[in-house]
Amino acid sequence: GIMFSPITSGYVNFWWMMTGSALILSGTSSLLNRGWWRGLNFSVLNIVLGIVIAVALWGVFWIGDKCASLLFDFARPQVDNIYGMKEGESQWLLTFLMLFLIGPAEEIYWRGYVQKNLSLRWGANWGFVITTLIYGVVHASSCNFMLTMAAMVAGAAWGLLYRFFPERFAAIIISHAIWD
């Protein structure tokens, strides 16, 4: 909430907060779920699948952006606000952080830890649904409807993929890293 809140966002650097959050979440997930990385397979197939998934999501979001802009007056300013967070920052640094830390850390936490453990406790379907809803609610603190809906759609896509193809977790991580 601190990173997105209209009240506090002017007092914190979004990218440093995301970096810190990514380190904490992925570190905690790794401590609580020791050895999770042993099942990762960064094969050529998973790399290609990750790229294809990211491109497919970009297509979905391109269409969604056009439709939302036609339907809602607030859509374009909210989307512009999301991309405006990159202004004044080193594009190389942001690309590095999103590719190698932030995107992968989100998947390690949300799918590799939260969804995996909720699925073990309540079954794969409920694990998917609950994780997707929590992922969306976390983004609601941004007070940005478009960001929250984007998180729900992307979270549902990655969650469904993890639900049915957990052995492709490396591809899911790659897709999130590229999509970011």
Go through each PLM region and give its residues.
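Transmembrane helix-loop-helix hairpins at the membrane interface
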Residues: G88-D180
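Alpha-helical transmembrane segments
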Residues: G1-M3, V52-L57, F128-I130
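Alpha-helical transmembrane segments of integral membrane proteins, especially early/N-terminal helices
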Residues: V12-L23, L49-I63, A157
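Alpha-helical transmembrane segments in multi-pass membrane proteins
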Residues: G1-G35
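Alpha-helical membrane-inserting segments
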Residues: F4, T28, L32, V60-A68, ...
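Membrane-interface elements of multi-pass transporters and channels
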Residues: I7, R34-G35, G39, C67-V79, ...
